[in-house]
């Protein structure tokens, strides 16, 4: 499977802000009606990582947000669609938060932990590999991901620990 064949990351200095911006441009093509504000507090955040794999993480997460928003739009066509992204660098870690106002994690009720397991899916045609691959990439980059229920949508937090790298 794709999952077993994940290549080892090739770690090089990359600008996380640039990687996220590139992926925002990419997904903006999918739906021009979704606002994607990106809040940064520095010009660059250099991080030792695999550019391709990190791109895959952000692309996957933002695409999930878009699908969630589209699901909500079927029932409520007139809401203002938004995915907000924020990146903050502290001394020993980098935090990235992605918040969307889609259908949220309610469908998961108690299964929010299962979301990272291979082949677990709530989508009609989902493979259940997306988030497990995201999780593997983040683990390989000394990162972790958390899924947080919020009132009107979903919140995903990624933390890269800079101490052990």
Language-model features and meaning:
Residues 35-45:
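Conserved catalytic submotifs in the C-terminal HATPase_c
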Residues 66-91:
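ATP-lid-like helix-loop hinge signature
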Residues 138-139:
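Detector for a conserved hydrophobic position within an alpha-helical segment of the HATPase_c
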Residues 130, 134:
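Short alpha-helical Gxxx[C/S/T] motif in the catalytic ATP-binding
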Residues 10-24:
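A conserved beta-strand-to-alpha-helix junction within the catalytic ATP-binding
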Residues 6-9, 46-49, 122:
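Conserved micro-motifs of the catalytic ATP-binding
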Residues 143-144:
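Conserved glycine-rich
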Residues 105-118:
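Short conserved segment of the HATPase_c
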């Amino acid at each position: 499977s794709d999952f077993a064949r994940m290549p080892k990351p090739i770690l090089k200095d990359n600008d996380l802000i640039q990687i996220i911006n590139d992926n925002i441009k990419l997904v903006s093509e999918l739906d021009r009606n979704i606002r994607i504000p990106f809040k940064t507090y520095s010009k660059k955040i250099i991080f030792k990582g695999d550019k391709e794999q990190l791109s895959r993480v952000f692309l996957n997460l933002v695409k999930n947000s878009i699908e969630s928003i589209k699901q909500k739009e079927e029932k409520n066509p007139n809401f203002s669609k938004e995915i907000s992204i924020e990146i903050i660098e502290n001394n020993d870690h980098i935090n990235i938060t992605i918040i969307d106002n889609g259908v949220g994690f309610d469908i998961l009720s108690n299964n929010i932990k299962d979301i990272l397991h291979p082949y677990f899916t709530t989508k009609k045609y989902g493979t259940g590999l997306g988030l497990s691959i995201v999780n593997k990439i983040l683990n390989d980059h000394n990162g972790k991901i958390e899924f947080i229920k919020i009132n009107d949508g979903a919140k995903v937090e990624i933390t890269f620990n800079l101490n052990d790298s």
